[in-house]
Swiss-Prot record:
PANTHER family: HOMOCYSTEINE-RESPONSIVE ENDOPLASMIC RETICULUM-RESIDENT UBIQUITIN-LIKE DOMAIN MEMBER 2 PROTEIN, HOMOCYSTEINE-RESPONSIVE ENDOPLASMIC RETICULUM-RESIDENT UNIQUITIN-LIKE DOMAIN HERPUD PROTEIN FAMILY MEMBER. Keywords: Membrane, Transmembrane, Transmembrane helix, Unfolded protein response. It comes from Mus musculus (Mouse). Residues 88-97, 109-126 have a biased composition (Low complexity). Could be involved in the unfolded protein response (UPR) pathway. Residues 127-153 have a biased composition (Polar residues). Its main location: membrane. It comes from the Eukaryota. Residues 10-89 form the Ubiquitin-like domain. The chain crosses the membrane at residues 301-321. SMART domains: UBQ. The gene is Herpud2. One of its GO terms (biological process) is spermatogenesis. This is Homocysteine-responsive endoplasmic reticulum-resident ubiquitin-like domain member 2 protein. It is a single-pass membrane protein.
Length: 404
């Protein structure tokens, strides 16, 4: 053996992987073997590990016991880092947690206090008593109410009570195993309730609109029929009908378009026209009027302007040239209703007079001739109707009128 190797000391820094002990500085010689180093560590290391339980690692290599340090350590390094790993053959038992000791102490104190006050105080049946349940596998404590355990049917009938207790549990208090934890309403149920609420709200709104329209029409009919019923009462004047007067003075908008749900149709073209659309419309009109003004006389320009104004007013509904028969007879409905009762009386009197005179046949022929003469139009009326129909057919019609 080289005698010079025995005189060369070397410094080793022993590190523990679990950081339980601080780094230990050990002085040895290069001619030592790994087994001799382990024996030295079993004497000087704080934990006094056994030689057979020690594992030395240097530069990621496990060192066997027969190798010498001079064959392993790098000579250019001043300090050599060696990791010591000890295999624990008899691991210490895990100490009891402070919470276990505290719970046992609290249970013992509560038992002693209950035994001290048992002579003076009687516990009520509804008093909540906490029971400690220890799980064999997980080791978790769960506290439940004794009332919920004694009456499980009531707990099943009212699961939200258990759910409220679960939300307000103390630390360390688990969920009762008999009742699953679930939310009150799932997201799908919330979406369904929102959809039903919107549907019901829309139906109520449509019913309110329809009821308002029906009530307004019914009030107008009652106002129109009230003077007829009171006209035959002697010594009483019929009360004024302000609603009827307002309806006679103001034009009735009978051309309101209704959608399928019962509400008025909103004209999207008028609502969606922005300032750019209006500028485009006015620019087209300005170009047309400038062409007419510069390439014709002033009188023709005035005529074209007047014609365009008439066409615009016709399309807007100010000058409806062709009205339906029902619309022409609409202003006369009130007068016809007012005179209906008197006309019926006159017809009855006329029928009685004709039956008395025996002139039913002759009066029937005269009435037929008068009706045919009244229905046969004259030559001027036919010509005027033809001319007006021809020229008004050249003018584009306005929006269609939907009768409700």
């Amino acid at each position: 053996m080289d005698q010079s190797g025995m005189e060369i000391p070397v410094t080793l820094i022993i590190k523990a992987p679990n950081q339980k002990y601080s780094d230990q500085t050990i002085s040895c010689f290069l001619n030592w073997t790994v087994g001799k180093l382990k024996t030295h560590l079993s004497n000087v290391y704080p934990s006094k590990p056994l030689t057979k339980d020690q594992r030395l690692v240097y530069s990621g290599r496990l060192l066997p016991d027969h190798l010498q340090l001079k064959d392993i350590l790098r000579k250019q390094d001043e300090y050599h880092m060696v990791h010591l790993v000890c295999a624990s053959r008899s691991p210490p038992s895990s100490p009891k947690s402070s919470t276990d000791r505290g719970s046992h102490e609290a249970l013992a104190s509560s038992t002693s206090s209950n035994s001290d006050h048992s002579d003076s105080t009687t516990p009520s049946p509804s008093q909540e008593s906490l029971s400690l349940v220890t799980g064999s596998s997980e080791g978790l404590r769960q506290r439940t109410l004794s009332q919920a355990q004694t009456d499980p049917a009531q707990s099943h009938q009212f699961p939200y009570v258990i759910q409220g207790n679960v939300d307000h549990q103390f630390p360390g208090q688990g969920v009762p195993p008999a009742f699953p934890v679930y939310p009150a309403l799932s997201p799908l149920q919330m979406l369904w309730w929102q959809q039903m609420y919107a549907h019901q709200y829309y139906m109520q709104y449509q019913a309110a609109v329809s009821a308002q329209a029906t009530s307004s029409a019914g009030s107008a009919q009652r106002a129109a029929s009230s003077p007829l019923n009171l006209a035959h009462v002697p010594g009483e004047e019929p009360p004024p009908a302000p609603n009827l007067v307002a309806q006679e003075n103001g034009p009735m908008n009978e051309n309101v378009q209704m959608n399928a749900q019962g509400g008025p149709v909103l004209n999207e073209e008028d609502l969606n026209r922005d300032w750019l659309d209006w500028v485009y419309t006015f620019s087209r009109a300005a170009v047309l009027l400038s062409i007419v003004y510069f390439y014709s006389s002033f009188s023709r320009f005035i005529m074209v302007m007047g014609a365009m104004l008439l066409v615009y007013l016709h399309q807007a509904g100010w000058f409806p040239f062709r009205q339906e028969g029902g619309q022409q007879q609409a202003p006369n409905n009130v007068d016809a209703n007012n005179d209906g009762h008197n006309a019926n009386n006159l017809e009855l009197e006329e029928m009685e007079r004709l039956m008395d005179d025996g002139l039913e046949d002759e009066s029937g022929e005269d009435a037929g001739e008068d009706a045919s003469a009244a229905q046969r139009p004259g030559l001027m009326a036919s010509a005027w109707s033809f001319i007006t129909t021809f020229f008004t057919s050249l003018i584009p019609e306005g929006p269609p009128q939907v009768a409700n």
